[in-house]
Amino acid sequence: MNVIPCSIKTLKGLYDISGVEVGQHLYWQIGGLQIHAQVLITSWVVIAILLGSVIIAVRNPQTIPTNGQNFFEYVLEFIQDLSKTQIGEEYGPWVPFIGTMFLFIFVSNWSGALLPWKIIKLPHGELAAPTNDINTTVALALPTSVAYFYAGLRKKGLGYFGKYIQPTPILLPINILEDFTKPLSLSFRLFGNILADELVVVVLVSLVPSVVPIPVMFLGLFTSGIQALIFATLAAAYIGESMEGHH
């Protein structure tokens, strides 16, 4: 079984998937590059919300914490607990990475329901949550893949690759393909759930614009938070797995 060409083909497929389009899109032409403007705009808004809220809440830490400081301390403790549970005692260096993934995805998902993106008119397409676009979810999944390969190589050196022939060399092709398909599952799970949630809300609003969409929107907020938690948990679990060397 020729594994290396299969793995290369899988990576090429993941790269090609990043070009998949749903609906119309607005592009900026910068030099010789075509930039997906909608994703950049909404991502910048999400990043600005995160940075702004953190700066406002903790720019002047108090001995007796304010409500904002308490909130972000709770978030930090939550991310530390999640990282420690999945990675183990060496979780410390990975808290910023896992926390960034969780917070960006969480705020991105919620922005699709809470921010009035559609009042901003564009020449082509419309604004939506960044995670509503496959380009964003693939861009989040690829660094996760790099992170767990890096974690394993840093911990075990070239001995890291010994896991591919455990418990038996017969499983070598499956073990290799498993690692290269992890970013596919991460990106499609997040993209599919967020896109489906927004489509359901749009359809219900068009059919019954007053009452029915409200509970569906609350359910969407809940599932959006769960999707952020699932992504961060799986990312931490993959990193912990690569450092421990077991499946």
UniProtKB/Swiss-Prot annotation:
Annotated Gene Ontology cellular component terms: chloroplast thylakoid membrane; plasma membrane; proton-transporting ATP synthase complex
Entry keywords, A to Z: ATP synthesis, CF(0), Chloroplast, Hydrogen ion transport, Ion transport, Membrane, Plastid, Thylakoid, Transmembrane, Transmembrane helix, Transport
Protein's UniProt keywords contain tRNA-binding: no
Record SUPFAM superfamilies: F1F0 ATP synthase subunit A (SSF81336)
Entry's transmembrane regions: 38-58, 95-115, 133-153, 199-219, 220-240
Entry-linked InterPro entries: ATP_syn_F0_a_bact/chloroplast, ATP_synth_F0_asu, ATP_synth_F0_asu_AS, F0_ATP_A_sf
Job of this protein: Key component of the proton channel; it plays a direct role in the translocation of protons across the membrane.
Cited NCBIfam families: ATP_synt_6_or_A
Assembly with partners or alone: F-type ATPases have 2 components, CF(1) - the catalytic core - and CF(0) - the membrane proton channel. CF(1) has five subunits: alpha(3), beta(3), gamma(1), delta(1), epsilon(1). CF(0) has four main subunits: a, b, b' and c.
Protein name per Swiss-Prot or TrEMBL: ATP synthase subunit a, chloroplastic
